[in-house]
């Protein structure tokens, strides 16, 4: 045995000092590895739509209701199943309603507790007692453990079991216990959650989604293009902050900044009212997708703010393009293509009339130079993002749980794309003097995204990393954007639709090719035959015949459009994916009404399951990434056991 092995085994022996303890731990590990694989739940592109997100999270994409049918399908009718499901999703709110509607509340408590315990026993059966115990609320842990691991059908245990429940009811703790059981069931039906990007965008409550995720028991996060914009703003990027405000103004969603995060936009409002007071800002009128009741004065002010921050954004983008020639974005230096006297712009060899040619803050000789007032304003805005504690807490969580991509249990997860040439080869990009492509490119993007947040303000490293974060939002070789260019300016200022075109990276055509998908999987160290790519970012237009299952099942696109704006386009309210011990299931969801409707009328999101891949042999924990680590631990312990038995190490009894 090598010296290094003995050194390691001596350390291991401190934790397992006897043959008995070592053998027991090996048996425990083998037992865990033989349990069924836990359920993975994949969500993508939530876009701030908290109500629908919360419902899908609470119902486990329909898993809770399926488990209820498994246990009580022959005993309960559909109405009773819906009622029990709603209770589990929203226990406190549902019990408030039932308390006023139920004649014999004591009997209802008793029946409900029996059912919830039986259901909880069922969903806990694939986990170790230790794992279930850790998931239990502290106040009820002992009682729950007693109830979950007793067989109350046996006569000698039945009285003991019923007495516990009767005491819970008589002591006035039934509602708290029902809530505890419901939340435990929610937690046990999904072992691990993957968010494949874009909590943020135009939806009203990304902050509530972040709060929920921060309290979730087990998850990871693959950053999306909208997430990266907020991360850049929180890192101190002026251009990212300007983009965040512009998008929020465009979709009448400034409340997320002012009310949810406490970022004051008063300096922007005062600036806009002064500089654009005589400007109708016709082409900067916000989109009122939610039909919220705003006064004309409010809309007028928001339109001015919208235009003011947009011009600042275009100037800041020009600064970056000019100082980062390696980004190869000179064609996006649009402010210098404007004829300010004629009110026209030259784009790709053609001249176009500008819809709006009122630019009071632009110096035609130095179009990217901020005025003193603009510089002061964007400084205040950037400081507000950096000093917002709640936003910083959310962004720190994104950094701690997130990444550009993830390999997990043989699958590859990423939000946007892997930049490809037409021939399927990986596109290269030079970063800090070195060329990167494929996996190494995404790894470098991740390193620089982290540097943008942690590097000291004012350093050249910080400035470069922040510029890269902006490039990830808008650049042609960005794995998060996936298009040739972002034509934001043209959409505001040029009527001709031909100028609005954003050509997709060849990846989006090639991802239908099974060989390309296998090539990508192998680039990331995965088995091209067995693995899958889980992708978000682009809404799947099911209404036009598009399928989320591509490349013979190798590519699964799970952005079905949580954002309400996409519902007409997609005919859906989103896709989620489930990966359990039996295989992969894609779940498509119809639009959600409201939480209040779900609680009162027991409506659920109508979901349709599609089995993508069924396992011939049920997957066990040993077949997962965690299983590989446990197997390695077991092998190390077997070496320790041999060392004890061969006399190389002595037991410490």
Swiss-Prot record:
Coiled-coil residue spans: none
Keywords: Carbohydrate metabolism, Hydrolase, Manganese
SUPFAM superfamilies found in the cross-reference section: Metallo-dependent phosphatases
GO biological process, one term: gluconeogenesis
This enzyme's EC code(s): 3.1.3.11
Family designation: Belongs to the FBPase class 3 family.
HAMAP family cross-referenced by the UniProt entry: FBPase_class3 (MF_01854)
Name recorded for this polypeptide: Fructose-1,6-bisphosphatase class 3
Source species: Listeria monocytogenes serotype 4b (strain CLIP80459)
Organism ancestry: Bacteria, Bacillati, Bacillota, Bacilli, Bacillales
Gene encoding the protein: fbp
């Amino acid at each position: 045995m090598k010296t290094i092995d003995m050194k390691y085994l001596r350390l291991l022996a401190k934790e397992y000092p006897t043959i008995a303890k070592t053998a027991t731990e090996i048996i425990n590990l083998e037992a865990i590895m033989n349990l069924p694989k836990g359920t993975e739940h994949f969500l993508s592109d939530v876009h701030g739509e908290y109500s629908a997100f919360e419902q899908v999270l609470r119902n486990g994409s329909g898993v809770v209701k399926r488990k209820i049918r498994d246990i009580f399908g022959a005993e309960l009718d559909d109405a009773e199943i819906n009622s029990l499901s709603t209770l589990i999703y929203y226990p406190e709110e549902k019990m408030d309603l039932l308390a006023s509607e139920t004649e014999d509340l004591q009997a209802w408590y008793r029946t409900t507790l029996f059912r919830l315990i039986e259901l909880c026993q069922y969903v806990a059966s694939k986990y170790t007692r230790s794992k279930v115990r850790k998931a239990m609320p502290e106040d009820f842990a002992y009682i729950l453990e007693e109830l979950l691991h007793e067989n109350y059908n046996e006569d000698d245990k039945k009285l003991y079991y019923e007495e516990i429940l009767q005491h819970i009811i008589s002591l006035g703790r039934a509602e708290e216990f029902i809530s505890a059981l419901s939340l435990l069931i929610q937690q046990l039906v999904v072992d691990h959650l993957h968010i494949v990007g874009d909590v943020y965008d135009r939806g009203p409550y990304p902050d509530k989604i972040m709060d929920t995720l921060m309290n979730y028991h087990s998850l990871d996060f693959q950053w999306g293009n909208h997430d990266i914009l907020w991360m850049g703003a929180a890192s101190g990027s002026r251009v990212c902050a300007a983009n965040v405000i512009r998008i929020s103004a465009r979709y009448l969603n400034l409340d997320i900044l002012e009310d949810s995060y406490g970022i004051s936009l008063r300096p922007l409002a005062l600036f806009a009212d002064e500089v654009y007071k005589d400007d109708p800002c016709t082409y900067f009128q916000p989109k009122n997708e939610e039909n919220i009741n705003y006064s004309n004065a409010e809309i007028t002010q928001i339109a001015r703010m919208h235009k003011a921050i947009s011009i600042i954004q275009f100037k800041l983008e020009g600064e970056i393009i000019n100082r980062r020639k390696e980004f190869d974005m000179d064609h996006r230096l649009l402010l210098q293509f404007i004829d300010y006297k004629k009110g026209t712009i030259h784009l790709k060899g053609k001249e176009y009339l500008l819809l709006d040619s009122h630019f009071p803050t632009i110096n035609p000789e130095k179009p990217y130079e901020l005025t003193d007032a603009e510089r002061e304003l964007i400084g205040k805005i950037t400081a507000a993002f950096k000093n917002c504690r709640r936003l910083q807490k959310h962004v720190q969580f994104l950094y701690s749980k997130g990444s550009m991509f993830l390999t997990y249990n043989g699958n590859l997860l990423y939000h946007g794309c892997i930049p490809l040439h037409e021939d399927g080869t990986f596109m290269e990009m030079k970063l800090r003097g070195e060329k990167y492509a494929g996996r190494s490119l995404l790894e470098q993007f991740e390193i620089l995204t982290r540097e943008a947040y942690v590097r000291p303000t004012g350093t050249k490293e910080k400035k470069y990393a922040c510029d890269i974060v902006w490039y990830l939002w808008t650049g042609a070789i960005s794995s998060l954007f996936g298009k040739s260019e972002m034509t934001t300016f043209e959409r505001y200022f040029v009527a001709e639709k031909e100028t609005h075109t954003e050509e997709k990276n060849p990846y989006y055509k090639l991802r239908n090719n099974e060989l390309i998908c296998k090539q990508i999987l192998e680039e990331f160290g995965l088995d091209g035959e067995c693995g899958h790519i889980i992708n978000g970012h682009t809404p799947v237009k099911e209404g036009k015949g598009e399928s989320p299952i591509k490349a013979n099942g190798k590519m699964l696109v799970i952005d079905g459009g949580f954002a309400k704006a996409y519902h007409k386009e997609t005919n859906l309210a989103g896709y989620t994916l489930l990966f359990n011990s039996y295989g992969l299931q894609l779940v498509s969801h119809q639009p959600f009404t409201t939480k209040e409707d779900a609680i009162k009328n027991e409506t659920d999101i109508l979901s349709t399951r599609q089995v993508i891949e069924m396992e011939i042999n049920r997957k066990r924990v040993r077949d997962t990434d965690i299983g590989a680590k446990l197997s390695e631990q077991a092998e190390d312990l077997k070496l320790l056991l041999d060392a004890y038995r061969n006399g190389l190490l002595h037991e410490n009894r």
